[in-house]
From Swiss-Prot:
One Gene Ontology term, aspect cellular component: cytosolic small ribosomal subunit
Protein name listed in UniProt: Small ribosomal subunit protein bS6
Organism name: Sinorhizobium medicae (strain WSM419)
rRNA-binding found in the keyword field: yes
UniProt GO BP: translation
The UniProt record lists the keyword Manganese: no
Family of this protein: Belongs to the bacterial ribosomal protein bS6 family.
Job of this protein: Binds together with bS18 to 16S ribosomal RNA.
Record keywords: Ribonucleoprotein, Ribosomal protein, RNA-binding, rRNA-binding
Region (Disordered): 94-145
Matches recorded under HAMAP family: Ribosomal_bS6
GO molecular function, one term: small ribosomal subunit rRNA binding
Pfam families, alphabetized: Ribosomal_S6
Length: 145
Protein backbone atom coordinates (compact mmCIF):
# COMPACT_ATOMS: atom_id res chain seq x y z
CA UNK A 1 0.00 0.00 0.00
CA UNK A 2 1.06 3.58 -0.65
CA UNK A 3 1.56 6.34 1.89
CA UNK A 4 -0.24 9.66 1.53
CA UNK A 5 -0.63 12.96 3.34
CA UNK A 6 -4.12 14.34 2.90
CA UNK A 7 -5.17 17.87 3.90
CA UNK A 8 -8.69 19.22 3.62
CA UNK A 9 -10.33 22.54 4.38
CA UNK A 10 -13.84 22.61 5.80
CA UNK A 11 -16.21 25.59 5.86
CA UNK A 12 -15.84 28.15 8.65
CA UNK A 13 -19.44 27.96 9.83
CA UNK A 14 -19.43 24.28 10.85
CA UNK A 15 -18.58 23.38 14.44
CA UNK A 16 -15.39 21.57 15.52
CA UNK A 17 -17.58 18.57 16.40
CA UNK A 18 -18.82 18.47 12.81
CA UNK A 19 -15.21 18.61 11.60
CA UNK A 20 -14.43 15.62 13.81
CA UNK A 21 -17.47 13.89 12.30
CA UNK A 22 -16.08 14.50 8.81
CA UNK A 23 -12.73 13.02 9.88
CA UNK A 24 -14.46 9.92 11.24
CA UNK A 25 -16.56 9.60 8.08
CA UNK A 26 -13.51 9.66 5.80
CA UNK A 27 -11.57 7.39 8.16
CA UNK A 28 -14.39 4.87 7.78
CA UNK A 29 -14.23 5.11 3.98
CA UNK A 30 -10.48 4.47 3.97
CA UNK A 31 -10.73 1.55 6.40
CA UNK A 32 -13.63 0.04 4.46
CA UNK A 33 -11.43 0.03 1.35
CA UNK A 34 -8.52 -1.71 3.08
CA UNK A 35 -6.45 1.23 4.30
CA UNK A 36 -5.36 2.70 7.62
CA UNK A 37 -5.32 6.25 8.93
CA UNK A 38 -2.36 7.13 11.11
CA UNK A 39 -1.90 10.58 12.56
CA UNK A 40 -4.79 13.05 12.35
CA UNK A 41 -4.02 16.69 13.16
CA UNK A 42 -6.73 19.27 13.46
CA UNK A 43 -4.99 22.59 12.77
CA UNK A 44 -8.07 24.57 13.76
CA UNK A 45 -9.81 27.55 12.21
CA UNK A 46 -7.34 29.62 10.19
CA UNK A 47 -7.66 32.60 7.87
CA UNK A 48 -7.52 31.95 4.15
CA UNK A 49 -5.27 33.97 1.87
CA UNK A 50 -8.19 34.61 -0.46
CA UNK A 51 -11.90 33.90 -0.32
CA UNK A 52 -13.06 30.43 -1.32
CA UNK A 53 -16.80 30.08 -1.93
CA UNK A 54 -17.46 33.22 0.15
CA UNK A 55 -15.47 31.89 3.14
CA UNK A 56 -12.65 33.92 4.69
CA UNK A 57 -11.65 31.19 7.17
CA UNK A 58 -11.55 27.40 7.15
CA UNK A 59 -10.97 24.44 9.44
CA UNK A 60 -7.72 22.71 8.38
CA UNK A 61 -7.19 18.96 8.96
CA UNK A 62 -4.17 16.76 8.10
CA UNK A 63 -4.46 12.97 7.80
CA UNK A 64 -1.62 10.47 7.29
CA UNK A 65 -3.02 7.65 5.17
CA UNK A 66 -1.65 4.18 4.38
CA UNK A 67 -4.07 2.87 1.77
CA UNK A 68 -4.40 1.60 -1.79
CA UNK A 69 -5.10 4.15 -4.52
CA UNK A 70 -8.81 3.22 -4.95
CA UNK A 71 -9.46 4.09 -1.29
CA UNK A 72 -7.93 7.54 -1.76
CA UNK A 73 -9.90 8.07 -4.97
CA UNK A 74 -13.12 7.20 -3.14
CA UNK A 75 -12.36 9.69 -0.33
CA UNK A 76 -11.62 12.41 -2.89
CA UNK A 77 -14.83 11.59 -4.79
CA UNK A 78 -16.88 11.94 -1.59
CA UNK A 79 -15.13 15.21 -0.70
CA UNK A 80 -15.95 16.59 -4.14
CA UNK A 81 -19.64 15.92 -3.42
CA UNK A 82 -19.66 17.27 0.16
CA UNK A 83 -20.53 20.96 0.30
CA UNK A 84 -18.78 21.40 3.66
CA UNK A 85 -15.37 20.67 2.08
CA UNK A 86 -13.85 23.74 0.39
CA UNK A 87 -10.56 22.22 -0.84
CA UNK A 88 -8.54 19.04 -0.42
CA UNK A 89 -5.12 17.86 -1.50
CA UNK A 90 -3.53 14.42 -1.37
CA UNK A 91 0.20 13.93 -1.78
CA UNK A 92 2.04 10.61 -2.06
CA UNK A 93 5.02 10.46 0.32
CA UNK A 94 7.89 8.02 0.82
CA UNK A 95 7.37 7.91 4.61
CA UNK A 96 5.28 9.71 7.18
CA UNK A 97 6.92 12.32 9.39
CA UNK A 98 7.43 11.52 13.06
CA UNK A 99 6.14 13.98 15.62
CA UNK A 100 4.03 17.07 15.01
CA UNK A 101 3.83 18.64 11.57
CA UNK A 102 5.30 22.05 10.79
CA UNK A 103 1.91 23.70 11.35
CA UNK A 104 1.66 22.29 14.88
CA UNK A 105 5.17 23.26 15.98
CA UNK A 106 5.06 26.48 17.95
CA UNK A 107 7.38 28.99 16.40
CA UNK A 108 7.74 32.16 18.41
CA UNK A 109 9.15 34.87 16.16
CA UNK A 110 9.62 37.40 18.95
CA UNK A 111 12.24 35.38 20.82
CA UNK A 112 14.98 36.28 18.31
CA UNK A 113 17.31 39.20 19.03
CA UNK A 114 16.39 42.43 17.26
CA UNK A 115 18.99 42.21 14.47
CA UNK A 116 18.26 38.68 13.29
CA UNK A 117 16.13 38.29 10.21
CA UNK A 118 13.79 41.21 10.64
CA UNK A 119 14.36 42.68 7.19
CA UNK A 120 16.81 44.56 5.00
CA UNK A 121 16.79 47.78 7.05
CA UNK A 122 17.75 46.38 10.45
CA UNK A 123 20.96 48.42 10.69
CA UNK A 124 19.30 51.86 10.33
CA UNK A 125 19.37 52.75 14.00
CA UNK A 126 16.76 54.87 15.80
CA UNK A 127 14.55 57.31 13.94
CA UNK A 128 15.48 60.99 14.12
CA UNK A 129 13.21 63.38 15.96
CA UNK A 130 10.63 64.89 13.61
CA UNK A 131 10.07 67.98 15.69
CA UNK A 132 6.76 69.52 16.58
CA UNK A 133 4.22 68.53 13.94
CA UNK A 134 1.87 71.44 14.68
CA UNK A 135 4.33 73.95 13.13
CA UNK A 136 3.73 72.73 9.61
CA UNK A 137 1.48 74.80 7.35
CA UNK A 138 -1.79 73.14 6.51
CA UNK A 139 -3.51 73.11 3.16
CA UNK A 140 -7.13 74.21 3.25
CA UNK A 141 -9.55 71.44 2.50
CA UNK A 142 -11.57 71.91 -0.66
CA UNK A 143 -14.90 71.35 1.03
CA UNK A 144 -14.27 74.25 3.50
CA UNK A 145 -13.38 76.86 0.87
Amino acid sequence: MALYEHVFLARQDITPQQVDGLVEQYKGVIEANGGKVGRVENWGLKSLTYRIKKNRKAHYVLMDIDAPAPAVHEVERQMRINEDILRYMTIAVDKHEEGPSAMMQKRDRDDRPRGEGRGPRDDRGPRPDRGDRDDRPRRPREDRA
